[in-house]
């Protein structure tokens, strides 16, 4: 199993159990790592019974369903929901991946969701990305102009068409 960066002197304990209230026969248990540093408590694993008949196919859909219908206090990152930005990266059943691209049907048994193991946990499934942002800034991944203009910089048709040629490669 993966080693997680837990708060010092902590032990993960059993948390709350949220029983399904829909009466559905198609239920999956989803175990989610929860920790709130403001509460001065140990991390816990909360278990949610989720009605899979009314849930879309991805793990991110399960988390959204939990947040919208069962427990609005759960904290996790999400953004594009198309596997591009990486915001929803987390550990699912022992493997790191994107919750927006991972189909819950690919995961056997109960679904265990943890934050990424190599990041300091800020809250629940949210890892500290400050080191990533510093590295990102150090490579300066933005366009730079050679001249300072007081007016808007208008792109030429050639520059726009070049951008459209490279975008599919970047998104692949």
Language model region names:
Residues 75-105, 165:
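Local cysteine-cluster metal-coordination motifs and their immediate loop/turn environment
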Residues 163-169:
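Conserved small/polar residues in nucleotide/adenosyl-binding loops
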Residues 1-73, 105-160:
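Iron-sulfur (Fe-S) cluster-binding modules
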């Amino acid at each position: 199993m993966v080693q997680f960066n837990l708060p010092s002197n902590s032990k993960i304990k059993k948390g709350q159990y949220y029983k399904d209230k829909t009466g559905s026969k198609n239920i999956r248990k989803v175990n989610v790592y929860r920790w709130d540093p403001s509460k001065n408590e140990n991390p816990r694993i909360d278990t949610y019974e989720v009605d899979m008949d009314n849930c879309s196919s991805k793990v991110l859909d399960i988390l959204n369903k939990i947040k919208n219908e069962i427990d609005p206090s759960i904290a996790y990152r999400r953004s594009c929901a198309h596997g591009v930005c990486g915001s929803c990266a987390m550990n699912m059943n022992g493997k790191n991946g994107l919750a927006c691209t991972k189909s819950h049907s690919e995961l056997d048994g109960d679904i265990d969701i943890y934050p990424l193991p190599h990041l300091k946990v800020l809250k629940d499934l949210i890892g500290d990305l400050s080191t990533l942002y510093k590295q990102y800034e150090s490579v300066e991944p933005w366009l730079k102009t050679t001249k300072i203009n007081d007016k808007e910089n208008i792109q030429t048709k050639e520059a726009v068409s070049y951008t459209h040629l490279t975008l599919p490669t970047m998104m692949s």
